[in-house]
A protein has these predicted regions:
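Acidic/aromatic-lined carbohydrate-recognition and catalytic surfaces
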Residues: 1-166, 170, 174
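C-terminal substrate-recognition regions of SAM-dependent nucleic acid methyltransferases
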Residues: 177
Length: 177
């Protein structure tokens, strides 16, 4: 978004250009609110219900979706489903000891299971984020972190995780995304 037009309103100002190119499908890279600082290009989402402030607002996203649709262009946003930022509310509540939210993640009390997994798991970023598990003092355990230590993998065996994302997807769909 920012490299093409600066903001969501900027993208809206370029719809005529997109139409002239024959674009019928516009995929915007991560634009939901990431963690502060290093966010792996926006893939460490801290809030799925808000847009990065420098890009605009959820109302701007909804307006853009409507304007694009009126021109025959479908809009999709990159929705990160594997993990959330360590600063996301669910991780914060897991650190606070709320069992419901601890269960949103794969947390191990010692290295027994992580070491067994590590024998066969490839490392995504071996040079700067080696391993797939990160010790977190707040939860008192090893958190599965496939990409970076600040990206906590979600436990998709937990139906509450599915329900949370169903709500997120429905909210975006109701906004025209």
């Amino acid at each position: 978004t920012e490299r093409f037009a600066g903001t969501l309103r900027g993208v809206e100002d370029r719809i005529d250009y997109l139409r002239e190119l024959g674009v019928t499908y516009l995929h915007l890279m991560p634009l939901l609110t990431p963690r502060p600082g290093d966010s792996d290009g926006g893939y460490a989402v801290a809030d799925y219900r808000t847009v990065r402030p420098d890009l605009g607002t959820m109302d701007d996203l909804e307006h853009l979706a409507g304007e694009l649709r009126a021109e025959g262009i479908s809009l999709v946003v990159d929705l990160v489903l594997n993990h959330v930022a360590a600063e996301h509310e669910w991780a914060v509540r897991a650190r606070a000891g709320e069992q419901r939210y601890r269960d949103y993640f794969l947390i191990f009390p010692d290295r027994t299971e992580p070491d067994a997994y590590e024998r066969t798991l490839p490392e995504v970023f071996p040079d700067f984020a080696p391993g797939n598990f990160t010790w977190d003092d707040g939860v008192g355990g090893w958190v599965w972190t496939t990409f970076n230590s600040f990206q906590w993998d979600l436990n998709w065996r937990n139906p509450h995780v599915m329900a949370e994302f169903a709500g997120i997807v429905l909210d975006l769909a109701n906004r025209g995304v």
